[in-house]
A protein has these predicted regions:
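Short alpha-helical elements
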Residues: 1-248
Length: 248
């Protein structure tokens, strides 16, 4: 009997699958990589040997395995990470703001949050990358989460120089996080009287690289979508999107 272990769960092969696990993952990643909006379009392109409903259920089900693969890639990236790292978060709306009060699929996870672009209803994606753009850590939280409260748990296994924007400025965070092997450097606000050294300024100039990760995930890998009709569908979309980006 074939068994694929993902954490404490087992995907057991009892009755033969109409479509293999490898094909399920490949189709899901193809959808994200090519920016295809719906699973229906993928089904019509490849015409797999199963029903459309079976394909949708399988893609959502095996997102747990995709998440396991993603975590393995993150751990591998951590081993050879650059000393300079960037931490930031981005908004992931689950629906249009005008439809938020009627939204049901993600009502237990989505919350109202605010960014520099305005209000949104959904989640936040927090990530840490190194100077080479490799993903080192990630976490999904409700949209109203304070970035500073996530920072320490997100980067607990990492060392080096951590570059962050002004939203992470906190004396308590610096006191808690800074050690002999790691230090956080937050970009000062315009109204703050803080003098930067040349090397600090040079490091801060590299922070825009993490914005490219968010831009690519949203524009080219379908991170944001309001089409799923269930919690599993939404989280599967996020997992496959990030995994496809890491495998690019």
């Amino acid at each position: 009997m074939l068994q694929i272990k993902s954490g404490s769960r087992l995907f057991e092969k009892g009755r033969p699958l109409a479509i293999t696990i490898a094909d399920i993952l490949a189709l899901a990643l193809f959808k994200q990589r090519e920016g295809i909006e719906t699973k229906k379009a993928v089904y019509e392109i490849f015409e797999p040997p199963c029903s459309y409903k079976t394909l949708v259920v399988s893609i959502n089900r095996f997102s747990l395995l995709a998440a396991r693969i993603l975590m393995i890639l993150v751990k591998l990236n951590q081993r050879k990470a650059h000393l300079v790292k960037h931490t930031d978060s981005t908004d992931i709306p689950v629906c249009n703001n005008r439809k938020a009060r009627y939204h049901k699929a993600m009502k237990f996870f989505a919350r109202w949050g605010k960014t520099g672009k305005g209000w949104f209803y959904g989640l936040k994606l927090h990530i840490t990358t190194d100077l080479k753009g490799k993903l080192l850590a990630l976490k999904l939280t409700p949209g109203n989460t304070d970035d500073r409260k996530v920072f320490c748990s997100l980067n607990k296994d990492l060392d080096g120089f951590f570059i962050a924007d002004a939203g992470y400025i906190s004396k308590e965070l610096e006191k808690t996080f800074d050690t002999d092997t790691r230090i956080i450097l937050a970009i000062p606000r315009a109204n703050m009287k803080k003098i930067l050294t040349d090397w600090q300024y040079s490091l801060i100039q590299t922070r825009m690289r993490i914005e490219l990760n968010f831009r690519n995930l949203k524009l080219f890998y379908g991170l944001i979508s309001n089409l799923p009709r269930s919690e599993n569908g939404y989280f599967a979309n996020y997992i496959y999107s990030i995994l496809a980006y890491c495998l690019k």
